[in-house]
């Protein structure tokens, strides 16, 4: 007896079609949760060596995949393009939907092998890579927002360091969102803030140079808002968020490197 389970996964639910020796014997819809998956599990247990096929739908099919792996069921996961090409021959009309029954019938035709399940560490690496990419995109967006708001409050500050980015720059932006915060402090206080703005070693000569340059830029600047403007808090917020994102992204990168070493 050959039993094929075709599963059409969507956002919150999945359509299940069960074919035995080529004939559909059952079909139903389950929620993508423990209750729904347990109903599917009950049917899987009634047959020997069930063939399970579904289309990869990103994060939506991830839970079904994890459930099947937890109970040691082999499955065939099709990428969307592969599914479309292989199922076109089973459609009466080109506009017909790829559904669970068609997925199951296609397995009878193509006899696909089960999808190779990699070690968990590889899934972790893919998740970390996606997380890293998302944080990189967040960093770019936040940098652009900081740049725009600084054009109103203290655009000259972007010229203090060689590049307007990184730990020291963002710390200085938080300390000096507009020129008044520079000109209201003594030179010794400014030197101390610059000294504390970086976790790296910085020479006294460099500190003195940056202090003099900062004062010059502040005197040159014309701020379009008052010291009480909420835009100054916005400047600080973006700078603080950039620090947080940068630090967190480095943690993720270190984790990726460590896990990659363990794969070898």
Which residues are covered by each model-predicted region?
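A detector of single, family-specific signature residues
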Residues: 1-264
């Amino acid at each position: 007896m050959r039993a094929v389970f075709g599963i059409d996964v969507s956002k919150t639910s999945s359509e299940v079609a069960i074919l035995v020796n080529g004939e559909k014997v059952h079909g139903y819809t389950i929620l993508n949760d423990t209750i729904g998956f347990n109903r599917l599990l009950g049917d899987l247990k009634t047959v020997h060596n069930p063939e399970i096929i579904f289309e990869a739908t990103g994060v939506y099919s991830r839970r079904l995949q994890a459930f099947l792996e937890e109970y040691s069921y082999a499955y065939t996961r099709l990428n969307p393009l592969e599914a479309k090409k292989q199922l076109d021959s089973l459609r009466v009309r080109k506009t017909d939907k790829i559904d669970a029954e068609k997925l199951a019938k296609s397995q009878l035709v193509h006899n696909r092998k089960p999808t190779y399940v990699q070690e968990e560490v590889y899934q972790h690496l893919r998740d970390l890579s996606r997380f890293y990419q998302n944080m990189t995109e967040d960093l770019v967006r936040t940098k652009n927002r900081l740049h725009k708001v600084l054009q109103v409050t203290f655009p000259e500050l972007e010229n203090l360091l060689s590049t307007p980015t990184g730990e020291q720059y963002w710390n200085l932006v938080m300390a000096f969102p507009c020129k008044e915060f520079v000109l209201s402090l003594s030179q010794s206080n400014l030197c101390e803030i610059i000294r504390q703005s970086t976790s790296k070693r910085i020479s006294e000569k460099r500190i003195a140079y940056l202090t003099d340059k900062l004062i010059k830029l502040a005197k040159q600047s014309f701020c379009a808002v008052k010291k009480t403007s909420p835009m100054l808090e916005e400047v600080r917020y973006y700078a603080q968020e950039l620090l947080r994102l940068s630090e967190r992204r480095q943690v993720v990168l270190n984790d990726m490197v460590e896990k990659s070493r363990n794969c070898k």
